[in-house]
Amino acid sequence: MKYDKLIIVESPAKAKTISKFIDNAVVIASKGHIRDLPVYSISVKIEDGKFIPRYEITPDHKKIVEDILHEAKDKKVYLASDEDREGEAIGYHIATILGGDIGSYDRIVFHEITKSAILKALENPRKLNMHAVEAQETRRILDRIVGYKLSPLVRKKVDYGLSAGRVQSAVLKLVNDREKEIAKFIPVTYYELPITVRTDTPASLVSHKELKITKQCLQDKQQALAIKASIESDKFKVVDITAKKASYKPQPPFKTTTLQQAASTELGYEPSKTMSIAQKLYEGVETPTGRKGVITYMRTDSLNLAKEAIESIRNKILTMHGKEYLSDAVRIYENKTKGAQEAHEAIRVTDVNFTIEDAKRYLEPEQFKVYKLIYNRTMMCQMSDSQIENQTVLINGTENVIKITGRKVLFDGWTKLKDKATEDIILPNYQIGSTIEIQAVQLDEKQTEPPARYNSASLVKTMEELGIGRPSTYAATIALLLNKGYVRTEGKAMYITDTGSKLSNFLEEYFPDIVDDKFTSNMETKLDEIALGNTDMHTVLGSYCIPLIEKIEKGNTDIPSLRVPDKRTGETCPSCKEHELVIKTGRNGEFKACSGYPKCKYIERPKVPVESKENCSYGLCPDCGEVLIKRDGRFGPYYSCSGYPKCKFMSKWPIAKEKCPTCGNWQQECASKTGETYYRCLKCKPIQPRKKDKKSKKKGQ
């Protein structure tokens, strides 16, 4: 068969899937950008107010470029990179190396990788969007100048190995500011009075005499005790019973941020992991009808759904669940995200007939979990409202008013697809005028809590709300902060590290624009304006980069150094036996290193006191039997063998003293996402729940 088409996509997985749909086409993957700014220099020339980038074919793309040039000789070329600014730029660079008129190349786009979508795209090609290319190039140059000009100053004035970035530094400030809020928070003690009436029904206090009871209003213990005594001695009667019906609409289909948030909350996945899994589902997996993409493009801030998709979703709801579960009218969701690209679709499944049951048989476990989230949200968004009857019983005493609330699900609607259904709270059959007996009144002492630390879900949500970054950069930005050791996690909570705090405080003091969320958001708006053709790259870059470069050059001499000077030890390096050992300060504290670096890379880890085997806190090494030591790493605490470097055992969790009851091997003492402790054998890996001490939850009794 003669191949007369060359389709150039970004990823090999996508190429593999598309090649099964088109018989007369060669499909090649560019594997991302074939040209980029080389890493060995800033590679941006500023001349007469113009910013001129110098691109090179990256070393690992030279063979791919040769293949593209060879295959393009006698074929019609279709540029089929992703439909976003990065994809548009990738297509532009490919067209550039192919030569000729850039405007002569056909550009095809699709939001799902199915045969019908690819054929439709081939029938409706367009030309490269040069405004989108210019917006991407502006972002690339901007980030290069910030990174290559500001980062050396940061390393010179703050510490080795640090870096600054336009988006990453603004996000780092969010985490740092939250840490400051928590540090200065002063807790306030307050009291609550949970009430139980006869038949074990919980009730709450509405008012006492003239005092309206609100959360945290009782901060005097004697006052709370007096009210408690008043309730216990009061006589109560039902004075009002109301039942109000309420409708609850389903949530819209997923976009990038809401998918990342749902996967973080429900599955415990980091945004980068969610996007990696979603990428595979988009590019193509095996299904009962062959290999295809099973979700639409996953980097989107749109809530739009294609007309054909809505029809198939609604038909599936009708056949699977019946007419009563289908919304009366088609649900259309409005985009509230600033700069949302309406041409894109929301994230949805491409084929509603590839059901959750099918997916469980064909997909890997982690892929299945993400697909299930997307499938259910795809269906829910066109289902009928859930109907709830909320019941309130108002009960008056001589000095106190209390209330009892209940709930009855009249119709589950879209909540039918939730893993955890809304449960009824059925109340006894109360009558107006009937007497109510108080069964118990507790006095609970509580304290106000500081603002919650960010987790992946809440940080992504805040980035979106403030306009910091774009859907394609959220996950990568968070991963970067973690990988560089500026932020660490404990469970889901994000903590600023000493290094991250020091860096953020420095940037906030000397380069406030870099870390200001409003400034960063405004820059994203300017990039959107370039993409719309309302302004140009040189105007935007000139207004920002020239003053920044001048400020950095001035800072090289004017900003005092915050770096801790090396301390001399008088000891000779045991490795090179030439230079003196010095004490340096790194991310995790002080350490000894050779002053001859980088010629000699000797490092001496700080000595940690080793406990006795009989009284060790973190268990014994399962490999050699030596005591485990707790250390602080760039990703948080970990446990390693005190016999290092002879034994290189490391573990995220300490080793339990109790051995596995199944095989007698060593076990890790782990903590679940909810903070509960469990044991995990290193050999057979069964999970053994830890026995809990029975403690009363009641206070003040």
Mark where each language-model region is.
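Conserved short loop/turn motifs at secondary-structure junctions
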Residues: 3, 82-83, 159-163, 243-252, ...
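Metal- or metallocofactor-binding catalytic centers and their adjacent structured scaffolds
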Residues: 215-254, 434
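Short acidic, hydrophobic short linear motifs in intrinsically disordered regions
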Residues: 241, 250-263, 289-297, 450-462
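A short, conserved structural fragment
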Residues: 282-296, 484-493
